[in-house]
UniProtKB/Swiss-Prot annotation:
It comes from Wolinella succinogenes (strain ATCC 29543 / DSM 1740 / CCUG 13145 / JCM 31913 / LMG 7466 / NCTC 11488 / FDC 602W). Homotetramer. Forms heterodimers with either ThiH or ThiS. InterPro entries: Aldolase_TIM, Thiazole_synthase_ThiG, ThiG. GO terms for biological process: thiamine diphosphate biosynthetic process. This is Thiazole synthase. The active site is at K100. It is found in: Cytoplasm. GO terms for molecular function: thiazole synthase activity. Pfam families: ThiG (PF05690). Its EC number is 2.8.1.10.
Length: 260
């Protein structure tokens, strides 16, 4: 059993990779990619994917018997009020109180979060007994405010949702890591396996990726690549990288070198 676990609220995860469920061609591929990733958590947009109506095709059916944790998210919500209502209804229908809080401020271009509405919703939901994983911008001050409001994990974007641009501000990932005590989960903008590895090397506790897997030419293969990248990045972070220096440093010893 791996002793280096990801702890969020009262739940413990062996995997530090979280996957999404959107943009796949069908539920079967979603399931197969998730299994290949060995992720133990999958996000589901409550407003866009049926998880509450048993009469319609249901993503939950594909994961029956698995230990994968469903993480309902509020994608599509733009205010604290509608988000709070959505999650309360979701909990009533499914019993799930482990949630990804996502409130979008710009719905047309950047899909950037509305951090003020997010902060308001976080405080209410946390007091209402939810375990809140809060999607936000890469601002260490807001990250700390969300933690103070009761968030059990902070999920700063690496780049705009679905952009595949990778981590645009590496320093802010480090600053957020230093500012909070709850897990930091890099979310949005991951485009390939190396992006996930870099996020972990910077100190992220986990990575969430959806589009990079779902829209890859081979989603199953990309899912396994993400799995390995997150593991490698975490090991690299724990091992401790060498310091960067402006000049060369010989890797072979010079003492006792033969002279000719």
């Amino acid at each position: 059993m791996n002793s280096d676990t990801l702890n969020i609220g009262n739940k413990i995860f062996q995997s530090r990779l979280i996957v999404g469920s959107g943009k796949y061609k069908d539920f079967k591929t979603t399931y197969e990619a998730t299994m290949a990733s060995e992720a133990e958590m999958i996000t589901v947009a409550v407003r866009r994917v049926n998880i509450t109506n048993p009469k319609e095709e249901n993503l939950l059916d594909y994961f029956k018997g698995s230990s994968v944790q469903f993480l309902p998210n509020s994608a599509g919500c733009t205010t604290a009020e509608e988000t709070i209502t959505l999650f309360r209804l979701t909990r009533e229908a499914t019993g799930i109180d482990f949630i990804k809080l996502e409130i979008i401020g710009d719905t047309q271009k950047t899909l950037y979060p509305d951090v003020m509405e997010t902060l308001k919703a976080c405080e209410v939901l946390a007091k209402d007994g939810f375990t809140v994983l809060a999607y936000t911008n890469d601002d260490p001050i807001m990250a700390r405010r969300l933690e103070e409001a009761g968030a059990s994990a902070i999920m700063p974007l690496a780049a705009p949702i679905g952009s595949g641009l990778g981590i645009q501000n590496r320093y802010n990932v480090v600053f957020i890591k230093e500012a909070i005590k709850v897990p930091l989960i890099v979310d949005a903008g991951v485009g390939c396996a190396s992006d996930a590895a870099i996020a972990m090397e910077l100190g992220a506790d986990a990575v969430l990726t959806n589009t990079a897997i779902a829209q890859a030419q081979n989603p199953i293969l990309m899912a396994s690549a993400m799995r390995d990248a997150v593991r490698a990045g975490r090991q690299s972070y724990l091992a401790g990288r060498i310091p960067k220096k402006p000049y060369a440093s010989a890797s072979s010893p010079t003492d006792g070198m033969a002279r000719f």
